[in-house]
A protein has these predicted regions:
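C-terminal catalytic "cap/lid" subdomain
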Residues: 1-234
């Protein structure tokens, strides 16, 4: 739903999204300044506040923040991005993307200790104090590691990692944690799912005991993921 909202918003504003395929096979959004502004409008605005509203209805005292607020997420802006087009590796410059390297844990601890539930979203802040689009899956892995989480759940529009994508009947139920980096398992990730698998690798390296790839389309997706549905890495 949220991806569709962002896509429709970009089309309505006359700036359709463009995706880049990197040499390693990962797919990411090309983020020029206009795209970044649309991203902020949709994710920091509509999506974040909608989630806060839903959580408040369930009795959780949620508070919505972006990585810009209080320098919550800080990282390095990429000066150039490599991508593949028609079999050739090219370089795109002027992108507003980056990787989070610092988390303002003191701010998060302050909120958590006061009884708030933070609802967090990119963008992050660069070291030059510019907004940068960052990978939410990488941020989730970083936070799970930072707080010693028992489990990390990644939700998407498929039931988990599929052996024969897009055949949902080919769901891979479990991956041994020590084998998550094996080529046969890394190869299961298609398109933007590669980012989630990379996040899982990072989380496992950081000591997270269980990572679950699960279906966002079902009722109670988090509860069902934690009960064993989807693809479980442990």
């Amino acid at each position: 739903l949220f991806i569709v909202t962002r896509y429709r918003s970009a089309l309505a504003l006359g700036h359709p999204p463009r995706f880049l395929t990197h040499p390693g096979g990962q797919v990411s959004r090309l983020t020029d300044r206009k795209t970044l502004e649309i991203f902020e409008m949709v994710y920091c605005g509509l999506v974040n506040k909608r989630l806060v509203e839903l959580l408040q209805k369930e009795g959780a005292n949620a508070i919505g923040l972006s990585g810009l607020d209080g320098r919550l997420f800080v990282g390095r802006r990429k000066t150039a991005v490599k991508y593949v087009e028609n079999g050739k590796v090219k370089v795109h410059r002027g992108d507003y993307t980056g990787t989070v390297e610092e988390v303002n844990k003191a701010l998060l601890d302050l909120l958590l200790q006061a009884g708030y539930l933070p609802v967090l979203t990119p963008p992050a802040l660069s070291y030059e104090n510019e907004a940068i689009n960052t990978d939410g899956d990488q941020i989730a892995a970083l936070l799970a590691t930072l707080y010693g989480a028992e489990a990390l759940v990644y939700l998407s529009n498929v039931p988990g990692l599929l052996a024969r994508y897009p055949d949902e009947a080919s769901l891979v139920r479990e991956i041994p944690v020590e084998r998550i980096e094996d080529p046969e398992y890394l190869a299961l990730a298609q398109g933007r799912m590669k980012r989630k698998v990379m996040g899982a690798v990072e989380a496992v390296r950081g000591g997270v005991k269980r990572v679950v790839f699960a279906d966002a389309r079902v009722e109670n997706p988090i509860r069902r993921a934690l009960s064993g549905e989807g693809t479980v890495v442990r």
